[in-house]
Amino acid sequence: MRLIPLETTSDVAFWSARYISDAINKYSPTKERPFVLGLPTGGTPLETYKRLIALYNKGEVSFENVVTFNMDEYVGLEQEHPQSYYRFMHQNFFSQIDIQIENTHLLNGLADDLEAECLRYEKKIKSYGKINLFIGGVGADGHIAFNEPASSLASRTRVKTLASNTRRANSRFFNNDINQVPKLALTIGVGTLLEAAEILILVTGHHKAQALEAAIQGNVNHLWTVTALQLHPKTIIACDAASTMELKVKTLKYFSELESDNIGYL
Protein backbone atom coordinates (compact mmCIF):
# COMPACT_ATOMS: atom_id res chain seq x y z
CA MET A 1 0.00 0.00 0.00
CA ARG A 2 1.13 3.52 -0.79
CA LEU A 3 0.37 6.57 1.36
CA ILE A 4 0.67 10.04 -0.17
CA PRO A 5 0.79 12.49 2.78
CA LEU A 6 -0.13 15.99 1.58
CA GLU A 7 -0.79 19.21 3.45
CA THR A 8 -4.29 20.41 2.61
CA THR A 9 -7.62 19.19 1.27
CA SER A 10 -6.93 21.20 -1.88
CA ASP A 11 -3.63 19.37 -2.31
CA VAL A 12 -5.45 16.03 -2.11
CA ALA A 13 -7.96 17.17 -4.74
CA PHE A 14 -5.26 18.47 -7.07
CA TRP A 15 -3.00 15.42 -6.65
CA SER A 16 -5.80 12.90 -7.14
CA ALA A 17 -7.24 14.68 -10.19
CA ARG A 18 -3.82 14.76 -11.81
CA TYR A 19 -3.27 11.09 -10.99
CA ILE A 20 -6.63 10.11 -12.50
CA SER A 21 -6.12 12.16 -15.66
CA ASP A 22 -2.62 10.76 -16.12
CA ALA A 23 -3.94 7.20 -15.70
CA ILE A 24 -6.57 7.80 -18.39
CA ASN A 25 -4.08 9.39 -20.78
CA LYS A 26 -1.49 6.66 -20.25
CA TYR A 27 -4.13 4.02 -21.05
CA SER A 28 -5.05 5.78 -24.32
CA PRO A 29 -8.67 4.57 -24.25
CA THR A 30 -10.69 3.95 -27.40
CA LYS A 31 -14.35 3.13 -27.98
CA GLU A 32 -13.42 -0.54 -28.28
CA ARG A 33 -11.05 -0.40 -25.29
CA PRO A 34 -12.47 2.12 -22.78
CA PHE A 35 -10.91 3.11 -19.49
CA VAL A 36 -13.20 1.89 -16.69
CA LEU A 37 -13.37 4.24 -13.71
CA GLY A 38 -15.09 3.61 -10.37
CA LEU A 39 -16.47 6.72 -8.69
CA PRO A 40 -17.73 7.87 -5.27
CA THR A 41 -19.86 10.79 -4.13
CA GLY A 42 -19.49 13.18 -1.20
CA GLY A 43 -17.60 16.28 -0.16
CA THR A 44 -14.07 14.90 -0.53
CA PRO A 45 -14.38 13.66 -4.14
CA LEU A 46 -16.39 16.77 -5.07
CA GLU A 47 -13.19 18.82 -4.97
CA THR A 48 -11.43 16.21 -7.09
CA TYR A 49 -14.25 16.40 -9.65
CA LYS A 50 -13.85 20.17 -9.82
CA ARG A 51 -10.14 19.71 -10.57
CA LEU A 52 -10.88 17.08 -13.22
CA ILE A 53 -13.37 19.43 -14.89
CA ALA A 54 -10.68 22.12 -14.91
CA LEU A 55 -8.21 19.71 -16.54
CA TYR A 56 -10.85 18.76 -19.11
CA ASN A 57 -11.53 22.43 -19.89
CA LYS A 58 -7.79 22.92 -20.45
CA GLY A 59 -7.79 20.06 -22.94
CA GLU A 60 -5.54 17.92 -20.74
CA VAL A 61 -7.92 14.95 -20.44
CA SER A 62 -10.95 13.56 -22.29
CA PHE A 63 -13.66 11.29 -20.91
CA GLU A 64 -15.13 10.39 -24.31
CA ASN A 65 -13.91 6.80 -24.04
CA VAL A 66 -14.26 6.42 -20.27
CA VAL A 67 -16.87 4.14 -18.70
CA THR A 68 -17.88 4.81 -15.09
CA PHE A 69 -19.44 2.78 -12.28
CA ASN A 70 -20.56 4.49 -9.11
CA MET A 71 -20.10 2.91 -5.70
CA ASP A 72 -23.56 3.22 -4.22
CA GLU A 73 -27.04 4.73 -4.19
CA TYR A 74 -29.80 5.25 -1.65
CA VAL A 75 -32.87 3.03 -1.84
CA GLY A 76 -36.13 4.86 -2.42
CA LEU A 77 -34.93 8.23 -3.72
CA GLU A 78 -36.05 9.45 -7.13
CA GLN A 79 -33.19 10.16 -9.54
CA GLU A 80 -33.90 13.89 -9.38
CA HIS A 81 -34.12 13.98 -5.58
CA PRO A 82 -31.62 16.63 -4.37
CA GLN A 83 -29.67 13.98 -2.44
CA SER A 84 -29.71 11.10 -4.90
CA TYR A 85 -26.25 10.10 -6.06
CA TYR A 86 -27.56 10.03 -9.62
CA ARG A 87 -28.28 13.74 -9.40
CA PHE A 88 -25.00 14.43 -7.58
CA MET A 89 -22.95 12.83 -10.34
CA HIS A 90 -24.81 14.43 -13.24
CA GLN A 91 -24.90 17.87 -11.64
CA ASN A 92 -21.34 17.96 -10.33
CA PHE A 93 -19.41 15.98 -12.93
CA PHE A 94 -21.01 14.24 -15.91
CA SER A 95 -22.79 17.32 -17.29
CA GLN A 96 -19.52 19.27 -17.35
CA ILE A 97 -17.28 16.85 -19.25
CA ASP A 98 -17.43 15.01 -22.59
CA ILE A 99 -18.43 11.61 -21.21
CA GLN A 100 -21.07 9.63 -23.11
CA ILE A 101 -24.06 9.34 -20.76
CA GLU A 102 -24.66 5.76 -21.90
CA ASN A 103 -21.20 4.98 -20.50
CA THR A 104 -22.15 6.11 -16.98
CA HIS A 105 -23.52 3.42 -14.68
CA LEU A 106 -25.27 3.93 -11.35
CA LEU A 107 -27.25 1.54 -9.18
CA ASN A 108 -31.03 1.97 -9.35
CA GLY A 109 -32.40 2.40 -5.84
CA LEU A 110 -35.95 2.34 -7.22
CA ALA A 111 -35.67 -1.07 -8.89
CA ASP A 112 -38.62 -3.42 -8.27
CA ASP A 113 -36.20 -6.22 -7.43
CA LEU A 114 -33.20 -4.79 -5.57
CA GLU A 115 -31.30 -8.07 -5.40
CA ALA A 116 -31.67 -8.54 -9.14
CA GLU A 117 -30.44 -4.98 -9.63
CA CYS A 118 -27.30 -5.79 -7.64
CA LEU A 119 -26.66 -8.91 -9.73
CA ARG A 120 -27.19 -6.91 -12.91
CA TYR A 121 -24.61 -4.36 -11.75
CA GLU A 122 -22.01 -7.03 -10.99
CA LYS A 123 -22.55 -8.58 -14.43
CA LYS A 124 -22.22 -5.19 -16.10
CA ILE A 125 -18.89 -4.56 -14.38
CA LYS A 126 -17.66 -8.01 -15.41
CA SER A 127 -18.69 -7.34 -19.02
CA TYR A 128 -15.84 -4.80 -19.15
CA GLY A 129 -13.34 -7.21 -17.62
CA LYS A 130 -12.51 -5.17 -14.56
CA ILE A 131 -12.46 -1.62 -13.27
CA ASN A 132 -9.11 -0.02 -14.10
CA LEU A 133 -9.14 2.53 -11.29
CA PHE A 134 -11.62 2.79 -8.44
CA ILE A 135 -11.73 6.09 -6.56
CA GLY A 136 -13.21 6.12 -3.06
CA GLY A 137 -13.53 7.95 0.19
CA VAL A 138 -13.69 6.61 3.73
CA GLY A 139 -16.02 7.27 6.65
CA ALA A 140 -14.91 8.13 10.17
CA ASP A 141 -15.69 4.52 11.15
CA GLY A 142 -13.68 3.16 8.22
CA HIS A 143 -16.57 2.35 5.91
CA ILE A 144 -16.02 2.49 2.15
CA ALA A 145 -19.08 3.00 -0.05
CA PHE A 146 -21.87 1.72 2.23
CA ASN A 147 -19.82 -1.22 3.50
CA GLU A 148 -20.41 -0.49 7.17
CA PRO A 149 -18.39 -1.98 10.07
CA ALA A 150 -18.77 -5.79 10.20
CA SER A 151 -19.29 -6.05 6.44
CA SER A 152 -17.86 -9.19 4.92
CA LEU A 153 -14.52 -8.51 3.27
CA ALA A 154 -15.63 -10.85 0.47
CA SER A 155 -18.99 -9.13 -0.05
CA ARG A 156 -20.48 -8.33 -3.44
CA THR A 157 -22.89 -5.62 -4.60
CA ARG A 158 -25.95 -5.86 -2.35
CA VAL A 159 -28.68 -4.16 -0.33
CA LYS A 160 -27.25 -2.75 2.89
CA THR A 161 -28.88 -1.42 6.06
CA LEU A 162 -27.19 1.84 7.00
CA ALA A 163 -25.68 2.25 10.46
CA SER A 164 -27.06 4.97 12.70
CA ASN A 165 -23.70 6.76 12.66
CA THR A 166 -23.73 6.89 8.87
CA ARG A 167 -27.30 8.15 8.73
CA ARG A 168 -26.51 10.74 11.41
CA ALA A 169 -23.43 11.92 9.48
CA ASN A 170 -25.41 12.12 6.23
CA SER A 171 -28.33 13.94 7.85
CA ARG A 172 -26.47 17.20 7.18
CA PHE A 173 -27.58 16.75 3.57
CA PHE A 174 -31.20 16.14 4.64
CA ASN A 175 -31.95 19.32 6.61
CA ASN A 176 -30.18 17.79 9.62
CA ASP A 177 -33.12 15.41 10.01
CA ILE A 178 -32.01 11.79 10.38
CA ASN A 179 -35.58 10.65 9.72
CA GLN A 180 -35.25 11.88 6.14
CA VAL A 181 -32.14 9.77 5.52
CA PRO A 182 -32.96 6.43 3.85
CA LYS A 183 -32.34 3.36 5.98
CA LEU A 184 -31.28 1.21 3.03
CA ALA A 185 -28.78 1.63 0.22
CA LEU A 186 -27.33 -0.36 -2.65
CA THR A 187 -23.56 -0.64 -2.53
CA ILE A 188 -20.72 -2.41 -4.25
CA GLY A 189 -19.14 -5.00 -2.00
CA VAL A 190 -15.66 -5.04 -0.52
CA GLY A 191 -14.88 -7.98 -2.78
CA THR A 192 -16.13 -5.98 -5.77
CA LEU A 193 -13.82 -3.11 -4.86
CA LEU A 194 -10.81 -5.37 -4.38
CA GLU A 195 -11.19 -6.75 -7.91
CA ALA A 196 -10.31 -3.35 -9.39
CA ALA A 197 -6.87 -3.18 -10.99
CA GLU A 198 -6.03 -0.14 -8.86
CA ILE A 199 -7.67 1.71 -5.96
CA LEU A 200 -7.22 5.36 -4.97
CA ILE A 201 -8.71 6.40 -1.62
CA LEU A 202 -9.06 10.04 -0.56
CA VAL A 203 -8.88 10.83 3.17
CA THR A 204 -9.22 14.34 4.58
CA GLY A 205 -10.00 15.87 7.97
CA HIS A 206 -9.08 15.11 11.57
CA HIS A 207 -12.34 13.14 12.01
CA LYS A 208 -10.92 10.53 9.60
CA ALA A 209 -7.68 10.11 11.57
CA GLN A 210 -8.69 6.88 13.32
CA ALA A 211 -9.80 5.34 10.05
CA LEU A 212 -6.49 6.23 8.41
CA GLU A 213 -4.56 4.82 11.36
CA ALA A 214 -6.51 1.56 11.09
CA ALA A 215 -5.85 1.38 7.34
CA ILE A 216 -2.10 1.93 7.64
CA GLN A 217 -1.15 0.53 11.05
CA GLY A 218 -4.03 -1.75 12.04
CA ASN A 219 -4.73 -5.41 11.40
CA VAL A 220 -7.15 -6.55 8.72
CA ASN A 221 -10.57 -7.01 10.32
CA HIS A 222 -14.21 -6.64 9.33
CA LEU A 223 -14.95 -3.94 11.91
CA TRP A 224 -12.74 -1.55 9.95
CA THR A 225 -13.66 -2.04 6.29
CA VAL A 226 -10.79 0.21 5.20
CA THR A 227 -8.26 -2.37 6.47
CA ALA A 228 -9.24 -4.64 3.57
CA LEU A 229 -7.18 -2.35 1.35
CA GLN A 230 -4.08 -4.01 2.82
CA LEU A 231 -5.04 -7.09 0.81
CA HIS A 232 -4.95 -5.26 -2.51
CA PRO A 233 -1.72 -5.23 -4.56
CA LYS A 234 -2.12 -1.67 -5.83
CA THR A 235 -3.80 0.70 -3.38
CA ILE A 236 -2.94 4.37 -2.91
CA ILE A 237 -4.26 6.55 -0.09
CA ALA A 238 -3.92 10.31 -0.61
CA CYS A 239 -4.45 12.20 2.64
CA ASP A 240 -4.13 15.65 4.18
CA ALA A 241 -2.15 16.54 7.31
CA ALA A 242 -5.21 16.68 9.57
CA SER A 243 -6.06 13.04 8.89
CA THR A 244 -2.58 11.80 9.90
CA MET A 245 -2.89 12.80 13.58
CA GLU A 246 -3.20 9.20 14.82
CA LEU A 247 -0.26 7.86 12.79
CA LYS A 248 3.03 7.18 14.52
CA VAL A 249 5.66 9.81 13.80
CA LYS A 250 7.99 7.21 12.29
CA THR A 251 5.19 5.89 10.05
CA LEU A 252 4.43 9.33 8.66
CA LYS A 253 8.13 10.06 8.23
CA TYR A 254 8.63 6.77 6.39
CA PHE A 255 5.93 7.46 3.82
CA SER A 256 6.86 11.13 3.47
CA GLU A 257 10.41 10.15 2.55
CA LEU A 258 9.35 7.19 0.41
CA GLU A 259 6.90 9.27 -1.64
CA SER A 260 8.88 12.53 -1.69
CA ASP A 261 9.18 12.53 -5.49
CA ASN A 262 5.48 11.75 -5.92
CA ILE A 263 4.42 14.40 -3.41
CA GLY A 264 6.34 16.81 -5.58
CA TYR A 265 3.95 15.71 -8.34
CA LEU A 266 1.91 18.73 -7.20
Swiss-Prot record:
Regulation: Allosterically activated by N-acetylglucosamine 6-phosphate (GlcNAc6P).
UniProt-listed Enzyme Commission number(s): 3.5.99.6
Reactions catalysed: alpha-D-glucosamine 6-phosphate + H2O = beta-D-fructose 6-phosphate + NH4(+)
Site positions per UniProt: Part of the allosteric site: S151, R158, K160, T161, Y254
Keyword line: Allosteric enzyme, Carbohydrate metabolism, Hydrolase
Transmembrane segments: none
SUPFAM superfamilies: NagB/RpiA/CoA transferase-like (SSF100950)
Enzyme class name: hydrolase
HAMAP family: GlcN6P_deamin (MF_01241)
Subunit structure: Homohexamer.
The family this protein is said to belong to: Belongs to the glucosamine/galactosamine-6-phosphate isomerase family. NagB subfamily.
Full protein name: Glucosamine-6-phosphate deaminase
Organism: Psychromonas ingrahamii (strain DSM 17664 / CCUG 51855 / 37)
Classification of source organism: Bacteria, Pseudomonadati, Pseudomonadota, Gammaproteobacteria, Alteromonadales
Gene from which the chain derives: nagB
